[in-house]
């Protein structure tokens, strides 16, 4: 209760085992300890949205959304992504190496991503590093992923990126609008 008396930051907060954590930065690191949740440090990498449109208000009903998360790993093949993206997935969160790199020399894999984006699938990239950020311009490999249709999740955690994808796609936004709003900081998720 003392925390509430001091005032809170805007947005969602997680209170667990006497610790208050900013919801958009929270991730669970431990499964067998009471201090299971931490706020991962990330740098600010996005412009704050001037206003949130009514259709994105949290009180608005949402449609169910079919999402998938795929970590990039040695041996990831185009056929893996083709099977997943052909299953009706509306959004794919690709967990890239470091600052947003992956198997960018695999032309078949890049074509699968490009075709999914053209079909209206929202493709986003975050870093596998707990304290990482996707900056596609860092390496040529990142530029190729961006050219295939991925949008940078910047320094968002997996939890924040998935929540944002559900909010945007569940509101019925088309993929272009969803990409535009995904790139903006709406509630501290990219701060």
Predicted regions, residues:
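A generic structural signal for short, solvent-exposed coil/turn residues
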Residues: 6, 61-62, 115
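Accessory alpha-helical/coil subdomains and C-terminal extensions
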Residues: 13-99, 104-106, 184-191
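ATP/nucleoside-binding phosphotransfer catalytic cores, i.e., glycine-rich phosphate-binding loops
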Residues: 104-191
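Short, glycine-/small-residue-rich phosphate/pyrophosphate-handling segment
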Residues: 1-14, 18, 22-27, 175-178
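A glycine- and small-aliphatic-rich helix-loop capping segment at beta-alpha/alpha-beta transitions
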Residues: 1, 28-34, 142-147
């Amino acid at each position: 209760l003392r925390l509430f008396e001091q005032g809170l930051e805007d947005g969602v907060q997680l209170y667990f085992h006497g610790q208050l954590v900013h919801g958009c930065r929270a991730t669970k690191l431990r499964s067998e300890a009471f201090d299971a949740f931490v706020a991962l440090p990330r740098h600010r990498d996005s412009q704050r949205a001037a206003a949130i449109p009514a259709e994105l208000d949290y009180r608005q009903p949402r449609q169910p959304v079919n999402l998938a998360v795929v970590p990039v790993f040695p041996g990831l093949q185009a056929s893996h992504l083709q099977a997943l993206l052909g299953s009706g997935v509306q959004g794919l969160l690709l967990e890239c190496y470091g600052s947003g790199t992956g198997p960018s020399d695999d032309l078949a894999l890049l074509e699968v991503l490009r075709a999914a984006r053209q079909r209206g699938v929202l493709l986003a990239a975050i870093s596998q590093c707990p304290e990482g950020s996707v900056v596609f311009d860092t390496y040529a490999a990142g530029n190729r992923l961006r050219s295939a249709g991925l949008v940078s999740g910047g320094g968002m955690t997996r939890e924040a990126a998935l929540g944002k994808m559900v909010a945007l796609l569940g509101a019925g936004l088309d993929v272009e609008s969803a990409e535009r709003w995904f790139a903006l900081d709406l509630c501290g998720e990219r701060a």
